[in-house]
Amino acid sequence: MPVPIVIESTGRAERAYDIYSRLLKDRIVLLGTPIDDQVASLICAQLLFLESENPEKEIHMYINSPGGSVTAGMAIYDTMQYINSPVSTLCMGQAASMGALLLAAGAPGLRFSLPHSRIMIHQPSGGFQGQATDIDIQAREVLRLKQSLNAIMSQHTGKPLEQVALDTERDYFMGPEEAQAYGLIDRVLTSRSEATDTISK
């Protein structure tokens, strides 16, 4: 699918942007695909660039993602925590698996969802092949990642680690209100003005 081009008029001049560059100008980062290494590199680069532009100003991350690679998702997560700029997150459509973790990892008070989105949490999975020893090594690594992800989710939601571990044993789907009660988001938004009101407070 071709990337749309938008034309912006400034006085007597006109300038053409691809839509993602235009959003970046407003400090908006869009995660709208499954998460892989290439996507993670692009998202991390945008976050680092926006921090260099103004480390005190908020960055808006809009999420519509089914999740994906754990290591790629953790690169985005660590970058969000590393930079000085606060990152607000907003789920539009769905935030599943690593997408849900990134949604929950937004700055406190700045984690939102639109009213008809869905959020899903679960444990990491992997398909293993090879010799028994290799399979055992991979299985132990998945267990390590599971414990790490559960600890992060517990930290950002305020839920006990044991509860998170239980809830992520299988796919756990939530609507926005349930996700708010769980601690994954802070507020359900129906209009942009509501987000502005929240930030101004």
From Swiss-Prot:
Question: Which taxonomic lineage does the organism of this UniProt entry have?
Answer: Bacteria, Pseudomonadati, Thermodesulfobacteriota, Desulfovibrionia, Desulfovibrionales
Q: Which Gene3D superfamilies match?
A: 2-enoyl-CoA Hydratase, Chain A, domain 1
Q: Using the chain's own numbering, where are the disulfide bonds? A: none
Main location group: cytoplasm
Question: What positions does UniProt annotate as the active site of this protein?
Answer: S97 (nucleophile), H122
Task: Note the HAMAP family from the entry.
Answer: ClpP (MF_00444)
Name the Pfam families on file. CLP_protease (PF00574)
Entry-linked InterPro entries: ClpP (IPR001907), ClpP/crotonase-like_dom_sf (IPR029045), ClpP/TepA (IPR023562), ClpP_His_AS (IPR033135), ClpP_Ser_AS (IPR018215)
Q: Would you tell me the protein name for this molecule? A: ATP-dependent Clp protease proteolytic subunit
Q: Which UniProt keywords apply?
A: Cytoplasm, Hydrolase, Protease, Serine protease
Assembly with partners or alone: Fourteen ClpP subunits assemble into 2 heptameric rings which stack back to back to give a disk-like structure with a central cavity, resembling the structure of eukaryotic proteasomes.
In its UniProt entry, the species of origin is given as Nitratidesulfovibrio vulgaris (strain ATCC 29579 / DSM 644 / CCUG 34227 / NCIMB 8303 / VKM B-1760 / Hildenborough) (Desulfovibrio vulgaris)
Query: Out of the domains of life, which is the source?
Result: Bacteria
For this protein, what is the EC number?
3.4.21.92
Record field: catalytic activity: Hydrolysis of proteins to small peptides in the presence of ATP and magnesium. alpha-casein is the usual test substrate. In the absence of ATP, only oligopeptides shorter than five residues are hydrolyzed (such as succinyl-Leu-Tyr-|-NHMec, and Leu-Tyr-Leu-|-Tyr-Trp, in which cleavage of the -Tyr-|-Leu- and -Tyr-|-Trp bonds also occurs)
Question: Could you tell me where this protein is found in the cell?
Answer: Cytoplasm
Q: What does this protein do?
A: Cleaves peptides in various proteins in a process that requires ATP hydrolysis. Has a chymotrypsin-like activity. Plays a major role in the degradation of misfolded proteins.
- Show the GO cellular component annotation of the record: cytoplasm; endopeptidase Clp complex
**GO terms for biological process, alphabetical:** protein quality control for misfolded or incompletely synthesized proteins
